[in-house]
């Protein structure tokens, strides 16, 4: 798959939306783009695949990648609070991830990747099946 049009669009814009019908190859495009850009991160449509459930709280789940990278605690706290706020998850920060609804889990999965500040963030159908409030929170998170 030729990624030249995507590369050109990303050179000109901060956000690019690629839309198409089911089976059009968008998931394949996301996987290939992830391989082409080392600083890219992908959140697949099944958000539960991105949540480890090994952490006791939502904020610990968001902090996991930062911990693994050795991010200093004050910086980790600042970044986690910022993405949780943008994702509308601040009030759920101390809740266990398994207690979240589907939309909340999707927001958690995106927040846990966005907090790492990847060079390129690829979201596979980020709004599929979401209520308007959850979709708005994801938009805010992506703009943060």
Give names to the regions the model predicted.
Residues 110:
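Hydrophobic anchor residue at the start of the ABC signature
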Residues 117:
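Conserved catalytic motifs of ABC-family nucleotide-binding domains
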Residues 74-92:
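Conserved ABC ATPase "signature" region
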């Amino acid at each position: 798959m030729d990624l030249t049009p995507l590369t050109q669009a990303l050179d000109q814009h901060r956000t690019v939306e690629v839309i198409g019908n089911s089976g059009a190859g968008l998931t394949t495009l996301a996987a290939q783009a992830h391989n082409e850009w080392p600083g890219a991160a992908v959140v697949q449509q099944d958000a539960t695949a991105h949540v480890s459930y090994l952490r006791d709280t939502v904020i610990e789940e968001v902090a996991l990648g930062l911990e693994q990278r050795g991010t200093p605690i004050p910086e980790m706290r600042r970044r986690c609070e910022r993405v949780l706020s943008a994702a509308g998850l601040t009030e759920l920060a101390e809740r266990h991830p398994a207690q979240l609804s589907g939309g909340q889990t999707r927001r958690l999965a995106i927040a846990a990747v966005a907090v790492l500040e990847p060079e390129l963030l690829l979201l596979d159908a980020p709004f599929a099946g979401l209520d308007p409030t959850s979709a708005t929170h994801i938009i805010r998170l992506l703009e943060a």
